[in-house]
Curated annotation (Swiss-Prot):
Family: Belongs to the plant acyltransferase family.
GO molecular function, one term: acyltransferase activity, transferring groups other than amino-acyl groups
Annotated source species: Narcissus pseudonarcissus
Signal peptide coordinates: none
Annotated S-S bridges: none
PANTHER family on file: SHIKIMATE O-HYDROXYCINNAMOYLTRANSFERASE (PTHR31642:SF11), TRICHOTHECENE 3-O-ACETYLTRANSFERASE (PTHR31642)
Domain of life: Eukaryota
Keywords for the protein's UniProt record, in alphabetical order: Acyltransferase, Alkaloid metabolism, Transferase
InterPro entries: CAT-like_dom_sf (IPR023213), Plant_Fungal_Acyltransferase (IPR050317)
Name of the protein in its database record: Hydroxycinnamoyltransferase
Tissue expression: Mostly expressed in stems, and, to a lower extent, in bulbs.
Active site, per annotation: 154 (proton acceptor), 383 (proton acceptor)
Length: 436
């Protein structure tokens, strides 16, 4: 796919905004240090002559950046070297592009390298203030459809806050007011004074590494290359999800059940020996779990992590593996109450170097896995005036072992799993995923 860039502009807030330095909480600082990629796809309505008109979008964007002014700023460091946001109103990058390709050529919208072409590339360097915190790209396809590619610097917002901004922008483009104004002050997530963690917080401990056991025997029909990774997306229908529920005796949340299934299938596909420790990273939104809950519209990162750990043999059994995996996940999630989350903030405050806790390839690779659910997020609400997206999902998966759970845009009760695994493991994972 060849992308032709037609226009690149910097869109600034349409009115003067506060010029200040915004303090980042510890949760804002332990996230991966890149722009989180996502892509929306839209079909063109038959009567739309101004479909995704850049003028309309840029005008609405400038207005949205007034209440969401940190998004138009840049990263900076305070006198102690701590990363903060310089709310200087320098703006966000807005790109208009076109391609001779058609939306249908993307098939199931797996977050491959081709999908990444729909998001502006950010050049990182030593100067953290050199790049915009938000980059956007409108790409017009020959079929008449359009994509919106979003790259959002993770220090600025998590998924919930990022969608709050995008959906507010789309509301303004439709002539509506912002439904929930953003709450900018992040000091609500300061650690207690003095910090007093009351749990060991294994979520921030090093991930298990592979045992020195002999490597599993490989399928001779599959070419082996441990460095090669593959990215795929798999749909689970409502009927398949109901069948999965019938396989366990206890009642589990949909997330615990599906995550348990993915954890089990991944462990088998990787050929983990029974005594191999494996950790599952479950991203958990703390907004409603904290007491009192954070204000509606809190803008920033509020992602904590539940991390069930098991010996692979406990979760790979044919009869009891799914129940064991789902049970561990549900218990780990139930523990994420106000006391635990406040303890996590205190634990982070006592760490001499938060950069050592930043998640990366070393976190999720074999034998571990991360699974982030977007099923409760309003990922299909960005209607700019020409209808809702037919698909929204990650624009790439940065690490082997990282996966996303996505809701259906059709409201049919299905969901999809987008995942990155070693290529030789992906084939077996797909087979296992559908053996319900």
């Amino acid at each position: 796919m060849i992308i032709n860039i037609k226009e690149t502009t910097m869109v600034r807030p349409s009115q003067p905004t506060p010029s200040q330095r915004l303090w980042n909480s510890n949760l804002d600082l332990v996230v991966p240090r890149f722009h989180t990629p996502s892509v929306y796809f839209y079909r063109r309505p038959g009567n739309a002559s101004d479909f995704f008109d850049a003028r309309v979008l840029k005008e609405a964007l400038g207005r949205a950046l007034v209440p969401f002014y940190p998004m138009a700023g840049r990263l900076a460091r305070d006198e102690d070297g701590r990363v903060e946001i310089d709310c200087n109103g320098e703006g966000v990058r807005f790109v208009v592009a076109e391609t001779d390709s058609a939306i249908d050529e993307f098939g199931d919208f797996a977050p491959t390298m081709e999908l990444k072409k729909l998001i502006p590339k950010v050049e990182y360097g030593d100067d953290i203030s050199a790049f915009p915190l938000l980059v956007l790209q409108i790409t017009h396809f020959k079929c008449g459809g359009t994509s919106l590619g979003v790259g959002m610097q993770h220090h600025v917002a998590d998924g919930a806050s990022g969608l709050h901004f995008i959906n507010s922008w789309s509301d303004i483009a439709r002539g509506l007011d912002i439904a929930v104004p953003p709450f900018i002050d992040r000091s609500l997530l300061r650690a207690r004074d003095p910090p007093s963690p009351s749990f060991p917080h294994i979520e921030y401990q090093p991930a298990p590494s592979m045992n020195t056991s002999p490597a599993p025997i490989q399928d001779p029909t599959v070419k082996s290359d441990p460095t090669a990774t593959a990215v795929s997306i798999f749909k689970l229908t409502k009927q398949q999800l109901d069948l999965l529920k019938s396989r366990v005796s206890a009642k589990y949340s949909s997330y615990a059940l599906v995550a348990g299934h993915v954890w089990r299938c991944t462990s088998i596909a990787r050929g983990l020996p029974d005594d191999q420790r494996t950790k599952l990273y479950c991203a958990t939104d703390g907004r409603a779990r904290l007491q009192p809950p954070l204000p509606s519209g809190y803008f920033g990162n509020v992602i904590f992590t539940a991390t069930p750990v098991a010996d692979a043999g406990e979760i790979t059994g044919e009869d009891s593996g799914l129940e064991a995996a789902a049970g561990r996940i549900q218990r780990a999630l139930m523990r994420m109450d106000d006391e635990y989350l406040r303890s996590a903030l205190d634990y982070l405050e006592l760490q001499p170097d938060l950069s050592k806790l930043v998640r990366g390839a070393h976190t999720f690779r074999c034998p571990n896995i991360g699974l982030t659910s977007w099923t409760r997020l309003p990922i299909h609400d960005a209607d700019f005036g020409w209808g809702r997206p037919i698909f929204m999902g990650p624009g790439g998966i940065a690490y082997e072992g990282l996966a996303f759970m996505l809701p259906s845009s059709e409201g049919d009760g299905s969901l999809s799993i987008a995942i990155s695994l070693q290529a030789e493991h992906m084939i077996k994972f797909q087979k296992l995923l559908y053996e319900i």
